[in-house]
């Protein structure tokens, strides 16, 4: 794996609640290599959104980040970033595409106005900023971009709005693009188009992408590496080929077995994972997947660290390491 553009070490995040502290992220270590696409998968509640919010410095007021952790980006620990640091980083250096493009698009401003405003840190004249915006819209596949740039968001379909959101995110050529389930609201055809678009833009713009999705098929198609999260922990991290062909963690194997696309290919009933996520306010001792795991042994009662299982493949499971 290549050198990281973003490096997370010993990240622990909890939320204060009436039931106590909800330990949403625990001992997260993660590298996002330069010029790679890293996918994050896991059930709802596994910590994906909290991880993204922490990277972006957008945690809720009731969140607590434990001391001792760090998120290194561009020579700066983002956990210690000031308001001035975030003004320099958010958008120009780390950009985000959200699930709902209307989260990024202002309905009462034309696309041109919004895309020109994004470039406020550059000293170029407005005409040059508009030219760059039109060029980026054209690159993401907006037809008649020079004309349609003056329209408003409601004039575009859902797929076109997501393309515009991607164009806006990439306009300042960020080093890291965070795509938070950007295809969930789109149909299958548009999903495929957005995935193809992200792959081509990643090659052209020479940046990294952190891609969050529930769709394992999209992860397999788009990503170079995959991170599997469960109940606030990273339980497996591998190249996409190795993870899909030889998953090591029991949770990863069960998650892949639940993929409807795999069931359609191989036949047979759709599997489910019994039980549910543990209570983050009262986590069990040892492996947090133990109560749902079909392969549990006595050693699972102790907390397990991430261990190398193969080249570029780590897993948080003592049985997976010893037995493959």
Model-derived regions: residue spans:
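Conserved ABC transporter NBD signature motif
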Residues: 66-77
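Conserved ABC ATPase "signature" region
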Residues: 76-77, 127-147, 256-257
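ABC ATPase NBD coupling module
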Residues: 78-95, 121, 242-247, 278-284
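A short, proline-enriched helix->beta-strand linker immediately N-terminal to the Walker B motif
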Residues: 171-175
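P-loop NTP-binding/switch modules centered on Walker-like glycine-rich loops
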Residues: 178, 182, 186-268
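Charged, flexible cofactor/metal-binding loops and thiol motifs
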Residues: 239-324
């Amino acid at each position: 794996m290549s050198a990281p553009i973003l490096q997370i070490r010993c990240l622990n995040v909890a939320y204060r609640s009436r039931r106590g502290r909800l330990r949403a992220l625990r001992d997260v270590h993660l590298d996002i290599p330069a010029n790679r696409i890293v996918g994050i998968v896991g059930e709802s509640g596994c910590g994906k959104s909290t991880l993204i919010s922490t990277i972006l410095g957008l945690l809720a007021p009731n969140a607590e980040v434990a001391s001792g952790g760090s998120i290194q980006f561009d020579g700066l620990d983002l956990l210690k970033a000031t308001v001035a640091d975030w003004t320099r980083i958010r958008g120009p250096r780390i950009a985000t595409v959200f699930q709902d493009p209307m989260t990024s698009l202002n309905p009462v401003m034309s696309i041109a106005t919004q895309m020109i405003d994004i470039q406020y840190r550059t000293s170029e004249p407005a005409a040059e900023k508009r030219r760059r915006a039109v060029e980026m819209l054209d690159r993401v596949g907006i037809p008649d971009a020079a004309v349609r740039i003056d329209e408003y968001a409601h004039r575009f379909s859902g797929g076109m709005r997501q393309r515009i959101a991607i164009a806006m995110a990439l306009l300042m050529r960020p080093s890291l693009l965070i795509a938070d389930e950007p295809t969930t609201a789109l149909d299958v055809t548009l999903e495929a188009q957005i995935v193809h678009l992200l792959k081509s833009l990643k090659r052209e713009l020479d940046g990294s992408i952190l891609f969050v999705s529930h769709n394992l098929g999209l992860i397999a198609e788009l990503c170079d590496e995959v991170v599997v999260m469960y109940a606030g922990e990273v339980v497996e991290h591998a190249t996409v080929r190795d993870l899909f062909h030889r998953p090591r963690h029991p949770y990863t194997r069960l998650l892949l077995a639940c993929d409807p696309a795999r069931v359609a290919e191989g036949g047979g009933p759709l599997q489910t994972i019994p039980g549910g996520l543990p209570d983050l306010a009262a986590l069990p001792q040892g492996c947090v997947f133990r109560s749902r795991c079909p392969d549990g042994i006595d050693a699972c009662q102790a907390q397990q660290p991430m261990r190398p299982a193969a080249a570029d493949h780590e897993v948080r499971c003592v049985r997976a390491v010893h037995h493959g």
